[in-house]
UniProtKB/Swiss-Prot annotation:
Keyword set includes Transit peptide: yes
Name by which UniProt lists this protein: Pentatricopeptide repeat-containing protein At1g66345, mitochondrial
Pfam family, one: PPR_2
Start and stop residues of the PPR repeats: 163-197, 198-232, 233-267, 268-302, 303-337, 338-372, 373-407, 408-442, 443-477, 478-512, 513-544
Swiss-Prot/TrEMBL GO biological process terms: Group II intron splicing; mitochondrial respiratory chain complex I assembly; mitochondrial RNA processing
Cellular component terms per the entry's GO annotation: mitochondrion
PANTHER family to which the protein is assigned, alphabetical: OS03G0856100 PROTEIN, PENTACOTRIPEPTIDE-REPEAT REGION OF PRORP DOMAIN-CONTAINING PROTEIN
Record keywords: Mitochondrion, Repeat, Transit peptide
NCBIfam families, alphabetized: PPR (TIGR00756)
Cell location: Mitochondrion
Length: 544
């Protein structure tokens, strides 16, 4: 009898609320109006309405029944949020989802970002992950630009008694809809807020970044993960190895580690070493050392690599004294010297012009049983060439070729550029021939420097041979090659040949300069051909 009476009273109160809503909305304006804030202290009328809707949902009323009962009610944001929180427990999460969709579809209501956040929290806690992902994606794709789902999820995290998994799903959804930079920003922000995201989230973010060919972003994400103590698994490492392959850097890193360790390293060591060197190359020395320390603590790189990287970092900063101290400590602790570390010292000495010290280090290196490699010799060749030791540069280039190593194109070009004596030009040309037979690929600058050297040494025939060798190799001679040839031909009295190459030059749309015209004019004047000298002069004036 008492329960029947209580139901009758509630029905009468409900009829009163509905009639008031229909006749005079202003009387309950604070309840039914749209509001972005949840009312923390709903009045009695509001409470009755909330209770009534909640009971209907608990009874699993159909959408049609709900629409019939509440057709005249104006659902505010605060009302929706309060009702959703009534169903925040896992066992009632489906009612929360039903109410969210009913209010959206039947009432044609555009939910606020806070309603989305509350519903997502409730669904994740109940492990209704497919529905949660769908709502996250819908919110990210359809919400106004000024709405921030991250803020709303953080603001409603405690009140909804949620779980950190919600933030993993959020970042994963950002990745899947290709909002990759935004997803990374959210990833960093959540880590800064104290949430530890899962390695699955890390893998999802780097996987989609890699598929989108944003390799730089992949490395930034991986670096951030290590910094925030989110450590990779086998899948992470597999993705990162694929990225190294796509970048064409895998062999480079593997070779580097072979020189440091003398043996092949695990894929995880390859990836982590590559990360530290990448950060170092960006001159972020402090960050690289912090990363290295963390990797060493987790045994994600070996000590030999750690010491070698620290030596490299100190040398990169120009602090050779500290670099040498670290190297000595490395040896004292029983680690072997390696070709990479020695080459670091050789490079710095060559850059500073202390080529004799670089040569001494090479001797020390070989006496220690450590074999120099191509980069060691490239540094020496470039150093000797830059600082006027052309014979020494040629000597080390010959040593390289004899040992079956190949000079880099840049080092070879620097050496050829420095030679001045004709005998050294011939020597350089012989080295080029041997190197080409072994697979060396010269560029235009290689031929340009040699052609200039032969012309300055009055060997025009050899210069012309190199010109036609360029043509045979499908290399297009540039301005410097034509300038050297034409000026050289004119200087040795072959003005007709000089004019022939001027015509070829212009036919290839390469503009001659004043030096070329002056050489032709002087050559014609020298043989008394005033007519052609005037013609070339007039042409020079017209093109200016």
């Amino acid at each position: 009898m008492a329960s029947a009476l209580r139901r009758l009273v509630e029905q009468q109160q409900w009829r009163y609320l509905v009639s008031q809503s229909t006749r005079s909305p202003k009387l309950i304006h604070g309840f039914f109006s749209f509001s972005s804030k949840t009312n923390p202290n709903p009045n009695k009328q509001q409470q009755i309405l909330i209770d009534y809707i909640s009971k209907s949902l608990q009874s699993n009323d159909t959408w049609e029944t709900l629409s019939t009962k509440f057709s005249s009610i104006d659902l505010s944001d605060s009302l929706i949020e309060t009702i959703l929180l009534r169903f925040k427990n896992p066992e009632t999460a489906k009612q929360a989802l039903s109410f969210f969709h009913w209010s959206s579809h039947t009432r044609n209501l555009r939910h606020g970002i806070k309603s989305y956040a509350l519903t997502i929290h409730i669904l994740v806690k109940a492990r209704l992950l497919i529905d949660a992902r769908a709502l996250i994606e819908s919110s990210l794709l359809n919400s106004p630009p000024d709405s921030d789902l991250v803020d709303s999820l953080l603001d409603t995290y405690e009140i909804s008694s949620s779980t950190p998994l919600v933030f993993d799903l959020l970042v994963q959804c950002y990745a899947k809809i290709r909002y990759l930079e935004l997803g990374f920003d959210v990833f960093k922000r959540l880590c800064d807020c104290g949430f530890t995201l899962s390695v699955i989230t890390l893998n999802t973010l780097i996987h989609y970044s890699s598929k989108s060919k944003i390799d730089d972003l992949v490395w930034r994400i991986y670096e951030c993960a290590i910094d925030k103590r989110i450590y990779p698994n086998e899948i992470t490492i597999r993705i990162m190895i694929q990225v190294l392959c796509k970048e064409g850097r895998l062999k480079e890193v593997v070779d580097l580690l072979d020189r440091i360790c003398g043996k092949r390293c695990l894929p995880s060591v390859i990836v982590n070493t590559s990360l530290v060197f990448r950060v170092l190359e960006e001159m972020r020395i402090e960050e690289s050392m912090s990363l290295l320390k963390r990797l060493l603590m987790k045994n994600m790189v070996v000590d030999t690599i750690g010491y070698s990287i620290v030596v490299y970092a100190k040398a990169k900063e120009g602090d050779l004294v500290s670099a040498r101290k670290v190297f000595d400590e490395m040896l004292q602790r029983g680690f072997s010297a390696n070709s990479f570390v020695y080459t670091v010292f050789v490079r710095v000495c060559c850059e500073k012009g202390d080529v004799k010290e670089a040569e001494r280090l090479l001797s020390e290196m070989e006496e220690s049983g450590v074999s120099p490699y191509d980069e060691t010799f490239n540094c020496l060749i470039g150093g000797f060439a830059r600082f006027g030791w052309e014979e020494k540069g040629l000597e080390y280039c010959e040593v390289m070729v004899t040992r079956g190593l190949m000079p880099s194109c840049s080092a070879f070009n620097e050496m050829v550029k420095s030679v001045s004596k004709i005998e050294n030009v011939n020597r350089a040309n012989e080295i080029l021939t041997k190197s080409i037979d072994k697979g060396f690929v010269p560029d235009e600058h290689t031929y340009s420097h040699l052609i200039r050297g032969f012309i300055e040494g009055n060997d025009i025939d050899q210069a012309l041979k190199l010109f036609y060798e360029m043509e045979y190799r499908k290399m297009s001679p540039g301005f410097e090659v034509f300038r050297s040839l034409i000026v050289g031909l004119c200087t040795c009295g072959k003005v007709e040949a000089g004019e022939k190459y001027l015509k070829i030059m212009k036919k290839r749309l390469i503009e001659p300069n004043a030096d070329i015209y002056d050489a032709l004019i002087k050559a014609f004047q020298k043989i008394g051909d005033k007519t052609n000298a005037d013609r070339v002069y007039n042409e020079m004036i017209s093109v200016r």
